Amino acid sequence: RQDLRAAEDALWRWMTAAALVRARGDGGVVMVVAESTIPTVQSLIRWDPVGHAEAELAARAEVGLPPSVHMAAIDGAAEAVSALLDEVRLPDGADVLGPVDLPPGVRRPAGTPPDVPVTRMLVRVPREHGLTLASALRRGVGVLSARQNTEPVRVQVDPLHIG
Protein backbone atom coordinates (compact mmCIF):
# COMPACT_ATOMS: atom_id res chain seq x y z
CA ARG A 1 0.00 0.00 0.00
CA GLN A 2 1.13 3.57 -0.55
CA ASP A 3 1.89 4.74 2.97
CA LEU A 4 5.04 5.92 4.69
CA ARG A 5 4.51 3.34 7.39
CA ALA A 6 3.70 0.35 5.16
CA ALA A 7 7.11 -1.31 5.55
CA GLU A 8 7.16 -0.58 9.28
CA ASP A 9 3.67 -2.05 9.72
CA ALA A 10 4.55 -5.12 7.63
CA LEU A 11 7.67 -5.83 9.68
CA TRP A 12 5.75 -5.36 12.93
CA ARG A 13 3.00 -7.77 11.80
CA TRP A 14 5.48 -10.35 10.55
CA MET A 15 7.56 -10.19 13.73
CA THR A 16 4.43 -10.41 15.89
CA ALA A 17 3.28 -13.50 13.98
CA ALA A 18 6.76 -15.07 14.05
CA ALA A 19 6.99 -14.53 17.81
CA LEU A 20 3.96 -16.81 18.22
CA VAL A 21 5.74 -19.75 16.56
CA ARG A 22 7.17 -22.38 18.90
CA ALA A 23 10.94 -22.54 19.35
CA ARG A 24 13.13 -23.95 16.59
CA GLY A 25 14.24 -26.78 18.90
CA ASP A 26 10.59 -27.77 19.26
CA GLY A 27 10.10 -27.88 15.49
CA GLY A 28 8.94 -24.32 14.97
CA VAL A 29 9.55 -22.82 11.53
CA VAL A 30 8.76 -19.41 10.07
CA MET A 31 8.51 -19.17 6.29
CA VAL A 32 8.48 -15.97 4.31
CA VAL A 33 7.28 -16.24 0.74
CA ALA A 34 8.64 -13.02 -0.70
CA GLU A 35 11.61 -11.69 -2.63
CA SER A 36 14.53 -12.01 -0.22
CA THR A 37 16.19 -8.78 -1.42
CA ILE A 38 13.36 -6.60 -0.13
CA PRO A 39 14.79 -4.63 2.83
CA THR A 40 11.81 -5.38 5.06
CA VAL A 41 12.16 -9.11 4.38
CA GLN A 42 15.88 -8.87 5.16
CA SER A 43 15.07 -7.18 8.47
CA LEU A 44 12.74 -10.05 9.36
CA ILE A 45 15.28 -12.69 8.37
CA ARG A 46 17.94 -10.98 10.51
CA TRP A 47 15.36 -10.16 13.25
CA ASP A 48 16.62 -6.57 13.12
CA PRO A 49 13.87 -3.99 13.73
CA VAL A 50 16.44 -1.41 14.89
CA GLY A 51 18.43 -1.71 11.67
CA HIS A 52 15.19 -1.43 9.72
CA ALA A 53 14.23 1.74 11.59
CA GLU A 54 17.68 3.26 11.00
CA ALA A 55 17.49 2.50 7.27
CA GLU A 56 13.96 3.95 7.04
CA LEU A 57 15.05 7.12 8.84
CA ALA A 58 18.03 7.55 6.50
CA ALA A 59 15.85 7.04 3.43
CA ARG A 60 13.26 9.53 4.66
CA ALA A 61 15.93 12.10 5.56
CA GLU A 62 17.26 11.86 2.02
CA VAL A 63 13.90 12.96 0.58
CA GLY A 64 12.74 15.23 3.42
CA LEU A 65 9.98 13.09 4.90
CA PRO A 66 9.00 12.57 8.55
CA PRO A 67 10.37 11.78 11.04
CA SER A 68 13.53 13.47 9.74
CA VAL A 69 11.50 16.69 9.47
CA HIS A 70 8.36 18.03 11.12
CA MET A 71 5.35 18.33 8.87
CA ALA A 72 1.98 19.98 9.34
CA ALA A 73 -1.11 19.08 7.34
CA ILE A 74 -3.67 21.84 6.84
CA ASP A 75 -7.05 20.64 5.58
CA GLY A 76 -10.07 22.66 4.53
CA ALA A 77 -11.64 24.65 1.74
CA ALA A 78 -8.95 26.11 -0.53
CA GLU A 79 -9.81 29.69 0.49
CA ALA A 80 -9.61 28.89 4.21
CA VAL A 81 -6.29 27.07 3.86
CA SER A 82 -4.88 29.99 1.85
CA ALA A 83 -6.15 32.46 4.45
CA LEU A 84 -4.36 30.55 7.21
CA LEU A 85 -1.11 30.34 5.27
CA ASP A 86 -1.32 34.07 4.50
CA GLU A 87 -1.79 34.83 8.21
CA VAL A 88 1.05 32.66 9.50
CA ARG A 89 4.71 33.66 9.65
CA LEU A 90 6.41 30.36 8.87
CA PRO A 91 9.83 29.53 10.34
CA ASP A 92 12.99 29.80 8.26
CA GLY A 93 13.48 26.85 5.97
CA ALA A 94 9.77 26.04 5.72
CA ASP A 95 8.50 24.43 2.51
CA VAL A 96 4.83 24.66 1.55
CA LEU A 97 3.81 21.62 -0.50
CA GLY A 98 0.56 20.97 -2.27
CA PRO A 99 -2.26 21.00 -2.68
CA VAL A 100 -2.57 17.26 -2.29
CA ASP A 101 -5.60 15.02 -1.92
CA LEU A 102 -6.71 13.89 1.51
CA PRO A 103 -5.33 10.41 2.20
CA PRO A 104 -7.87 7.59 1.82
CA GLY A 105 -9.98 7.18 4.93
CA VAL A 106 -9.26 10.67 6.30
CA ARG A 107 -12.47 12.52 7.13
CA ARG A 108 -13.25 16.04 6.07
CA PRO A 109 -12.66 18.76 8.67
CA ALA A 110 -15.62 19.12 11.03
CA GLY A 111 -18.04 21.81 9.93
CA THR A 112 -17.01 21.76 6.26
CA PRO A 113 -20.13 21.70 4.07
CA PRO A 114 -20.39 18.49 2.01
CA ASP A 115 -20.47 20.40 -1.28
CA VAL A 116 -17.20 22.27 -0.59
CA PRO A 117 -14.08 20.58 -2.00
CA VAL A 118 -11.44 19.94 0.66
CA THR A 119 -7.77 20.46 -0.05
CA ARG A 120 -4.65 19.66 1.94
CA MET A 121 -1.48 21.71 2.10
CA LEU A 122 1.65 20.43 3.79
CA VAL A 123 4.22 22.57 5.56
CA ARG A 124 7.61 20.97 6.10
CA VAL A 125 10.26 22.38 8.45
CA PRO A 126 13.59 21.13 9.80
CA ARG A 127 13.31 19.24 13.10
CA GLU A 128 14.65 22.17 15.12
CA HIS A 129 11.75 24.40 13.97
CA GLY A 130 8.87 22.08 14.92
CA LEU A 131 7.80 24.04 18.00
CA THR A 132 7.99 27.33 16.10
CA LEU A 133 5.79 25.90 13.35
CA ALA A 134 3.21 24.57 15.83
CA SER A 135 3.10 27.91 17.67
CA ALA A 136 2.71 29.91 14.46
CA LEU A 137 -0.11 27.69 13.22
CA ARG A 138 -1.89 27.83 16.60
CA ARG A 139 -1.71 31.63 16.52
CA GLY A 140 -2.96 31.75 12.92
CA VAL A 141 -5.92 29.50 13.66
CA GLY A 142 -6.78 31.72 16.63
CA VAL A 143 -6.69 34.87 14.50
CA LEU A 144 -8.92 33.32 11.82
CA SER A 145 -11.31 32.00 14.44
CA ALA A 146 -11.60 35.46 15.99
CA ARG A 147 -12.45 36.93 12.58
CA GLN A 148 -15.20 34.34 12.04
CA ASN A 149 -15.13 34.89 8.31
CA THR A 150 -13.56 31.69 6.97
CA GLU A 151 -14.53 28.06 6.59
CA PRO A 152 -13.10 25.74 9.25
CA VAL A 153 -9.59 24.35 8.85
CA ARG A 154 -7.97 21.38 10.53
CA VAL A 155 -4.29 21.53 11.42
CA GLN A 156 -2.34 18.42 12.37
CA VAL A 157 1.35 18.55 13.23
CA ASP A 158 3.19 15.35 12.34
CA PRO A 159 0.12 13.43 11.12
CA LEU A 160 0.45 9.68 10.54
CA HIS A 161 -0.81 10.02 6.96
CA ILE A 162 0.36 12.98 4.90
CA GLY A 163 -1.31 12.37 1.56
Predicted regions mapped to residue ranges:
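Accessory helical-bundle/CTD segments and flexible terminal tails appended to RecA-like ATPase motors
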Residues: R1-D9, T16-G163
